[in-house]
Amino acid sequence: MTTKKSSYTYPIFTVRWLSIHALAVPTVFFLGAITAMQFIQR
């Protein structure tokens, strides 16, 4: 299992990590904002 492939896929800070967080953080923020707006209106 200890091959060059493991060292290639081991780093967490990759393009996939950036893309997931770039999409996840705004979605969580917008969902929280939408729910807060709905509770404030009522």
From Swiss-Prot:
Cofactor requirements of the protein: heme b
Keywords noted in UniProt: Chloroplast, Electron transport, Heme, Iron, Membrane, Metal-binding, Photosynthesis, Photosystem II, Plastid, Thylakoid, Transmembrane, Transmembrane helix, Transport
UniProt keyword Membrane, yes or no: yes
Gene Ontology molecular function terms on file: electron transfer activity; heme binding; iron ion binding
Superkingdom to which the source organism belongs: Eukaryota
GO CC, alphabetical: chloroplast thylakoid membrane; photosystem II reaction center
Listed Pfam families: Cytochrom_B559
Record localization: Plastid, Chloroplast thylakoid membrane
Transmembrane region(s): 17-33
Membrane topology: Single-pass membrane protein
Known partners and oligomeric status: Heterodimer of an alpha subunit and a beta subunit. PSII is composed of 1 copy each of membrane proteins PsbA, PsbB, PsbC, PsbD, PsbE, PsbF, PsbH, PsbI, PsbJ, PsbK, PsbL, PsbM, PsbT, PsbX, PsbY, PsbZ, Psb30/Ycf12, at least 3 peripheral proteins of the oxygen-evolving complex and a large number of cofactors. It forms dimeric complexes.
Family: Belongs to the PsbE/PsbF family.
UniProt function note: This b-type cytochrome is tightly associated with the reaction center of photosystem II (PSII). PSII is a light-driven water:plastoquinone oxidoreductase that uses light energy to abstract electrons from H(2)O, generating O(2) and a proton gradient subsequently used for ATP formation. It consists of a core antenna complex that captures photons, and an electron transfer chain that converts photonic excitation into a charge separation.
NCBIfam families named in the record: cyt_b559_beta
HAMAP family membership: PSII_PsbF (MF_00643)
Protein name: Cytochrome b559 subunit beta
